[in-house]
Curated annotation (Swiss-Prot):
InterPro entries in the cross-refs: Ribosomal_bL32 (IPR002677), Ribosomal_zn-bd (IPR011332)
Organism: Paenarthrobacter aurescens (strain TC1)
GO molecular function: structural constituent of ribosome
Composition skew (Basic residues), residue ranges: 1-19
Any Gene Ontology biological process: translation
Protein's name in the database: Large ribosomal subunit protein bL32
Region (Disordered): 1-20
A family per Pfam: Ribosomal_L32p
Keywords per UniProt: Ribonucleoprotein, Ribosomal protein
Superkingdom, taxonomy of origin: Bacteria
Family: Belongs to the bacterial ribosomal protein bL32 family.
GO CC annotations, alphabetized: large ribosomal subunit
Length: 67
């Protein structure tokens, strides 16, 4: 394992750590039953009834799992 020869300065440490960024997910805007929902592409969506109770999960219009 590599061992640093000298102590790294605070500025260099922070400059190096600044490169570790989280990427924002690409959300897809869909309109269902008059409501705008944002979801991740290629993931199952929760189908709810009018009261907001989760019924099941669907993907590409098919039921894939119970809620």
């Amino acid at each position: 394992m590599a061992v640093p020869k000298r102590k790294m300065s605070r500025a260099n440490t922070r400059a190096r750590r600044a490169q570790w960024k989280a990427t924002a997910p690409n959300l897809v805007k869909t309109i269902e039953n008059g409501q705008v929902t944002y979801s991740l592409p290629h993931q199952a969506k929760v189908v709810t009834d009018s009261a907001g109770t989760a019924l099941f999960l669907e993907y590409k219009g098919r039921k894939v799992a119970d809620a």
